[in-house]
Amino acid sequence: MSHNRRKFLGVAAMGAGALSISSKLFANTSDSNQHADIPSVIERLKPMKDGVIPISVEERKQRIAKAQELMSREKIDGIFIEGTTSSFYFTGMLWGQSERTFGLVIPAKGAIAYVCPKFEEDRARELINPVFGDEVRCWEEHESPYALIAGIIKDRGVKYNRIGMEERVRFFIADGVRKVAPGFEIVDATPVTAGCRMYKSDAEIALMQRSNDVTIAAYQAVFPTIRDGMSQAELSNNLTAAFSKLGYNGGAMVNIAKYSALPHGSIVPQTIHEGDVILVDGGTSCEGYASDITRTIVLGKPTQRQLDVWNLEKAAQDAAFAAIKIGVTCESVDFAARSVIESAGFGKGYKLPGLPHRTGHGIGLEGHEWTNFVKGNMTKIAPGLCFSNEPNISIPGEFGIRLEDCLYIGKDGPHFFTKQSKSIEQPFG
């Protein structure tokens, strides 16, 4: 699933409260002007907020310390992060992006400091947790923020003359720092940020478990309401309403019949009819941590062709899971799933009809993050990694089948967050 790597975050400033997925991320199937009555089964849903434990200040301190260790290993004096997901990861603050530079510097040694437009300082200080560092260096509208970024790193101590830029930092900022601080080499900070964020703690996995549980609860409430003549938009709106009743922002992409063969759907309005394949791909987030679940069913009795392809897809998903062992490469998981589909006569590699994309992606604070089950990825499976497992069989002009469940790697190997579909008639295990 991908809408700009399907970021499960808003762009408004937030404090340590929950990030929330916007149902607009799935808006290609939703019609905000539709006011269909919400089915009673959805109205009866109760919030699933009890027992949610946010990430602690102590854990965020440990993340910063790990980032500083990785900077030393990578020979980086400090990294700059805009007010996006990595800012939330390390400090609990999400600011967003505009044409005005705002962000934070994590130095290899010393406390975090922030770079902020002067007129935004009061708002920034409302959101900043001073336990991580309370220094805010401000720039007026006619001044350069880039010298402030370099200045923080210089003042904390320079050893390698290298400044790391987090992957979401825009070019004009990185280039601005390069121009005002020519003595520094500008480098990629992904080995630091991904080196931290890829490996989830027990607390993070617990939050992801909740977001997956909520998604399944929403699906289980809504799927029985599917009927002949229902529009794609009505089904999508029902899913959004179910998430809301459960206390979360969420939604799903819905694609029907031949449009289910398009992995990320179509803008064409669709209506459900008896015998159609219906693919629902969506999720929510809990304290920012995402779920991503796909279920594919048929309204009414499936044809033998639909049943055979569904069962093949399930076999491919099972093969991927069976291939996941601590120490094996991520590409080997993709190979396992793809081999099942190819052996049934479907296209080699990414050719259609067949599996047109990787078998799975990393997931955490973003719906798509490091690392992927894909050819060429030699990253080794290790505890703390989290992935989607979603081989997909696309048959253009006919239909597509995708089953998607996310999983985490424990010390003893892989564990699904959700029960897999048992059959085309039993999508919830």
Residue locations for each model-derived region?
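Active-site neighborhoods and metal-handling regions in enzymes and metal-associated proteins
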Residues: 2-429
